[in-house]
Each structure stands twice: as structure tokens, then as C-alpha cells.
Amino acid sequence: MSKINKLEHIRNIGICAHIDAGKTTTTERILYYTGKSHKIGEVHEGGATMDWMEQEQERGITITSAATTCRWQDKIINIIDTPGHVDFTIEVERSLRVLDGAVAVFDGVAGVEPQSETVWRQADKYNVPRMCFVNKMDRMGADFYRCVEMLKDRLGAKPLVIQLPVGIEENFKGIIDLVKMKVVIWKDESLGAEYFEEDIPADMKDKAEEYRAKLLDMVVELDDHVMEKYLSGEEVTAEEIKRLIRKGTISAAFYPVLCGSAFKNKGVQPLLDAVVDFLPSPTDIGIVKGMEVSTGEEKDFPISVTEPFAALAFKIMNDPFVGSLTFIRIYSGKITSGTTVINTVKNKREKIGRMLLMHSNNREDVKEASAGDIVALAGLKDTTTGDTLSDIDQPVILERMEFPEPVIELAVEPKSTADQEKMGLALSRLAAEDPSFRVSTDHETGQTVIKGMGELHLEIIIDRMRREFKVEANIGAPQVAYRETITKACEIDYTHKKQSGGAGQFARVKIIFEPLKDVKDLKDEDKIFVFESKIIGGAVPKEYIPGVEKGLNNIRETGVIAGYPMIDFKATLVDGAFHDVDSSVLAFEIAAKAAFREGMPKGNPKLLEPIMQVEVITPDEYMGDIIGDLNSRRGQIQSMDPRGNAQVVTANVPLAEMFGYVNTLRSLSQGRAQFSMIFSHYDQVPSQVADIIKAKK
């Protein structure tokens, strides 16, 4: 197969969903049926191939996105298995950035759950074409049709049903293929490897005809010629239907919906067929956005083997045998071992040593890789997640990834002073792997502080430090990552002057500080801090203005109320003055810091806290107690909906009130209720609570 043709035969896909919807089991079955795995790994037995970290096998959840390559028909499928737990959304985010398509797995009983919504929104952000697999159709309470309705209501998606289940719950035995209008039944004795087609039974004929008509109504809209044929009563062929399903999936006009039970080995092969038939190849995506380093011009670069080399590093992983591995998605060109490329973000050269194709945590050495491939590179020195590797002669920077701010922090210290250095090394390695995990030193106490996306996230970091780096640590109580902001605009004119013999220092700045919510035409709503210079006529020379921005950026890390980072504000430099001899970048940096300290208290500063969206699923009888408890935690109930024989309560609750909630919920519901939470937004802390927080600082 020539390299250029090869691109059309590649499918880079992610399998993503809510925790426990059955993503890892689905991936295991895919590996089994494509011949990559000789035995089926079960998640609940701790034997799943994709869950290769010790913690994952113990907890039965997927933490890091393992990448694996398999073949189906004549196509190469690169699969990234992503975690469904909310503390690991960063893994999902960076996987989606480099994928061409995704399979969203839904629990046939629970339907669309909170994390499913988060993942769906992330996929929307990166315009990832996707299809839906309604799993667990064999389980008590599974309802395919309700799940399809939830896709519309919860996600605002346009589902295109292309399969219907045959039998429900324990009698689920196969599917109706609405394209071929045939029933597919699996043989249990062959572990689902053998299946056969038969005619649709009479009792399901009407349902199948109804959904076939809905399918045709949606797909023929994409092609005038086929629509004319359909409206004139002519038969639309299966090939035409498949072509239009592919067209609509790639353009996100709709999302094909399939069903099955991965655990019971039913529905996986048609899912693989659909991945190959309907999800895009790199050539369907066609372009990747980036910037030409030489001109600074943003442009679209073609995805092609014949273009210069460009790749995005999307994950760093420490392998116990190979050391640090950098996973890259190659967008254009090709690369061979021994080549030198440039990291255009850091402006550092990197020599390509070992290149590996990964199957979960088994490795296969390769000498060459090209556009469309996902490979791991061993031994890169300066490359981190989100960096671009590029051809030295034609350097480009591909669109960067954005990572969320951590919402929870812990103080850690090694149990013995001898481990201090080891702990520092371990934490810096783990931070290199995971951009949503940060390490810093508290200036006042000298303590090491680790920050992450939730309690489980930090728990696993500490666990990995113990297992992989042999460092035992004492940990403090979890702390909330509070922030500060201003609520009204203020102006400050500050002059920094220092004369003490020899060279002096002089800088004058006039800055307007204002809340970001008051700023019109803000391109990125999520910007933490915006700086703008409106200096006209050289009141402050151009070369000194970066000093003002740097000073403000540094000083905003310690706010004026309780020393928490300041966010959601804009600083505009409107005037200033300089001295020919005594002014410098440093002098303007100092002046900006002092202006911040003096000006911010006039902006009516407020303390902000992270608010979490909490979803509790509970039997009816505990509803009252659970709502009462959420209200006592300063929660605001958003909605209450029935789901099967349970109730779903959605509330916005401050993170500070949610520590240890898992134990409270267990005792309130005798262990029958469950909850999940995701970060929603920052909001002002009520004044009486703010006083307590200030007193503690």
C-alpha cells in the first residue's frame, strides 16, 4: 500500500464516555475480534489490556489514555481509550485534540450521564465527528429508545438510529441492521466471534420499517439526486445509504446510533464496520490549523505525506523499561529514526531515537512513521504536552491545547528528609506527564503544594509517587483553590523612583483595572487576565511595555484579600513616563507591581470559590434527606428528574463543602445512592464565609 493511499485507510478514533459505561470493555472486545488480544480481559477482574497501570487494575477505572493500533478489514484503526472519571477530563481533552473521530459509549440503563455531557462538549470544541454506541443492552432496566431521546434532550444532538435491539435485558440477543434490513444474531458459544444474519421477525417488522423511514428521511437531505429518487418511490441502495451516512457523520449533520452489549460479546463487529464505513480518515479532515514560524501567519496546513513533517505531542508517559515516552500524532510528512527535528514552541532541536507503536503497554519498534500515524518517541529532552515537532527547514506551530486550572490542592512532604530530592524529581516527572497537575512551593511556609482536578486525581498521584518512585509522603488536608477578583473599575497612577548613588530607577505607569465581565468583544470568555497597552506617542517606550505586563502577571499570583491568585480582570496601560538614563524594563516591572498593590483594593475585591455541578442518583425514599443535606452545604438545586426507578438531583455546590461527601451520601442512602461532580465555574464567596477564610490565612 503506498503511503498516500495509506492515509485513506487510517482511522484515528477515541472511545470515550461516563465512568462505568463500558468503554474499556468495548475496547477489549475490539482488540479481541481484530486479533490483537488472544484472550478477553475483564475490567472487574483487573485483567483489561488497556488498563495497564497498577492503580487502574485495582480500581477498575481507566486513568491514562492508552493508545493501541489494530486492523479491521483493510483499515488501520488507532484507538485511544480515555478515562470517564471527572478528575481525568484532561486526558479526554488531549486525546480529542489529536483524533479524527470518536465513539461515545453510553450506558443503556443510565443513558446520558454528567461526564457524558462533559465529553460531548469537549468533542464539540474540537469538532470531532462521532457516533454513539448504546452499551449494556443486556442489563436490567436497559432502554435503547429512552437513551436516544436523552441524546436529543441532554446533548442537543441529532441521533441517526441505524440499529435496533432484538430482545431486551437478559433476552437481548442481537440487532436489526436498518441499512441492510436484516437481523444479526450472535452465537454465545463462540464468545461472539461467530454471528449470522436472518430476516426480520414479523413482530418487529413495523418498528424496523418506522425507523428505516426516519433514517432515509434524514440521509436523503444530503443529496438532491438521491432525494429525487426516494421521493419518486425508487429503492435507495444500501451503498447510497452508507455513503450518505458517512457524509453526514463527517459533517456532524447527525450522529449514527448503534447498540449492543460488549460484555456479552454482542454488537462489536458491526461497531467496527461502522468505524471503518462512517468515521473520517485523515484525508477527510484535510487540514490542521497552525502558524508559520517564519512569518507568524496563521494558516491551514494540508494533512499529507508529501508535505514537510509536522506533529503534535499530546501525552508524556513514564515507561518502567523505556523511560519517558512522548506520544505524537503526525499530521504531515514522515519521520525516521535518527532524524533531527525542531520543537517550535521551545525552539529546541530534538533527535528522534527509538520510535514505538504502542499496544496498550506492549511496544513494537518501528523505523518510520508518516502522516496519520500515532507513535511514541523515546528519550525526547525538552518536549512537553501540546508542543509541536516540525521540519527544521519549514517550521510550523500547530494549534495549542488549553488545559483547565486545578481546583484542589494538598501540602505534601516526604516522610524522611533523605527523600526530599527524590520527591521533587518524582513530582516534576508526574507534572510533565499531566498538564492539569501542578507543583509549587508555598513562599510563606516553604511547603510543597500539589494541585489537581479532584481528590481522586491527587490520591492517584501520591499513589504513583509511592509505587513508581518509592517515595513515601505525609499529606495535609485538601485545600480549595480559591481565587480573587475585582468587581468595579479603578485607575491608579504610580511613580517608582529610586536614587541611591550610581544608576537610579525611574518608571511611571497609569493603569486602569476593570472586571473582565465589563469588557466588551472579549474573544475568549475564559481568559484569566488580559493586558492591553494604549500608549500613544512614546510616553512609555515599546521595549518597556513587556515589563509592565510581566510585573502584573507575576504579582497577580498573590491577591490583595487573602493572597490567592487574582483572575477575571483586565489591565490597560493608558499613560506613563520614563527617564533616559534611569528607566529600564525592571523599573517598569516594579512600578506595575506597586500599582497593582495600591490599585486593586480600590476595585472592591472579592474572594471567589470553585462551584461544582453535582449529580446525585438516588432511590425515591432518600430524596428528601439528600436534598436537605445539599442545601446545608450551600448547594443550589438545579433540577430533579426521574430516571427509571431512581431520582436524579442536579445541584451547584461549592467545592469547599464537598470534601468527604461520599461517606455522608453512603450513610444517608444506606450505600444505594451514587454521585459525580464536575467543575462548573467560580463564584463569589458569601461575606461571612469569606471572613472565616481570611482569618485562616
UniProtKB/Swiss-Prot annotation:
Domain of life, per lineage: Bacteria
GO MF annotation list: GTP binding; GTPase activity; translation elongation factor activity
Presence of the UniProt keyword GTP-binding in the record: yes
Keyword terms: Cytoplasm, Elongation factor, GTP-binding, Nucleotide-binding, Protein biosynthesis
Residue stretches making up the tr-type G domain: 8-283
GO biological processes: ribosome disassembly
Assigned GO CC terms: cytoplasm
Binding locations of GTP: 17-24, 81-85, 135-138
Entry-linked InterPro entries: EF-G-like_DII, EFG_II, EFG_III, EFG_III/V, EFG_IV, EFG_V, EFG_V-like, G_TR_CS
Family: Belongs to the TRAFAC class translation factor GTPase superfamily. Classic translation factor GTPase family. EF-G/EF-2 subfamily.
Taxonomy of the source species: Bacteria, Pseudomonadati, Pseudomonadota, Alphaproteobacteria, Rickettsiales
Localization annotation: Cytoplasm
Matching SMART domains: EFG_C, EFG_IV
Keyword Cytoplasm included in the entry's annotation: yes
Protein name per Swiss-Prot or TrEMBL: Elongation factor G
Function: Catalyzes the GTP-dependent ribosomal translocation step during translation elongation. During this step, the ribosome changes from the pre-translocational (PRE) to the post-translocational (POST) state as the newly formed A-site-bound peptidyl-tRNA and P-site-bound deacylated tRNA move to the P and E sites, respectively. Catalyzes the coordinated movement of the two tRNA molecules, the mRNA and conformational changes in the ribosome.
